[in-house]
Amino acid sequence: MKRDITQLLSPELSQSSSRNDKKRKPTNSNKKVQTVLNFPSSSPNASQSTTCPTCGMTYYSHVSKDNDVHNKYHFNFINGIPWPTSFCNNVLERFIVVDHTTGKAKGTSKSKKSQAASKETLVMTIDRRASKQVKRVEEILKVVNGELNAASDGKAWQKDHKGPIQGRAFIVVIDGRAIGICTTEPIQDVDQQCRWIIHRTQALVPNQVNRSIKLGISRIWIAPKWRRYGLARRLLDIVLVHSVYGIVLDKKEIGFSQPSFSGGLLAKSFNGVTHKSGEILIPVYLEE
């Protein structure tokens, strides 16, 4: 029986029962929850939370502090997370991206002509021994997982692995902000991990092992402002070149983990193959 790929690639704990059990003793939890006291308000919706349709953050719009937190998170989500110059010590490639922006003249309803600005773009890896860099990558991944509605990754990019292929975190930086990320994971057990999915249905192909995969793409993400510039595809090409010292990986040696709809389109264009049935297959792997 076919199952959804997200169930197979990113299993989650089943939800606990919502039934009230008066005999059950309350348990302690270390999870921090923001609490807002519900005082009477002239606004009928004052006690209701708001979820931003763009960044996905849930907050209380009538609370000034919540608004400030949301505004900061929203800006970083759209434009990228701050990335200090001191973190840019392992730059792999530099290139130019032409940023097309439109503005509106003050006092008029007419839009200005598109203005193009050349932006130097850096792609780098992090120093895993630098705790501040590791922490910043973890912050970025929280944003990524939040948008993808994905569980936390296996942190393979932080670990040392046997063999020539290591997990890495590749960062794309423009104007001092991390606007893209790709984390990778070396395959440990081909038979247990490597599969194919049907792009149209996202169902696993039964009883098939993809023995070509050597490196998994755990997460790949570009900040919304910088999408449709071809950066995700370019980032994958850089991963091929810089994942194994002295060797350029082939596209068929790359597998994807839990691809979202947009991620599935990226994977399809990058290394999808057409089966004799006419279905397009995407190489995937199961995260350990």
Curated annotation (Swiss-Prot):
Probable acetyltransferase required for the establishment of sister chromatid cohesion and couple the processes of cohesion and DNA replication to ensure that only sister chromatids become paired together. In contrast to the structural cohesins, the deposition and establishment factors are required only during S phase. Acts by acetylating the cohesin complex component SMC3. It is found in: Nucleus. A zinc finger (CCHH-type) spans 50-74. It comes from the Eukaryota. GO terms for molecular function: protein-lysine-acetyltransferase activity; zinc ion binding. Transmembrane segments: none annotated. Its EC number is 2.3.1.-. SUPFAM superfamilies: Acyl-CoA N-acyltransferases (Nat). One of its GO terms (biological process) is mitotic sister chromatid cohesion. This is N-acetyltransferase ECO1. The keyword rRNA-binding does not apply. One of its GO terms (cellular component) is chromatin. The lineage of its organism: Eukaryota, Fungi, Dikarya, Ascomycota, Saccharomycotina. Residues 27-50 have a biased composition (Polar residues). Signal peptide: none annotated. Keywords: Acyltransferase, Cell cycle, Metal-binding, Nucleus, Transferase, Zinc, Zinc-finger. Residues 7-18 have a biased composition (Low complexity). Residues 1-50 are annotated as: Disordered. Belongs to the acetyltransferase family. ECO subfamily.
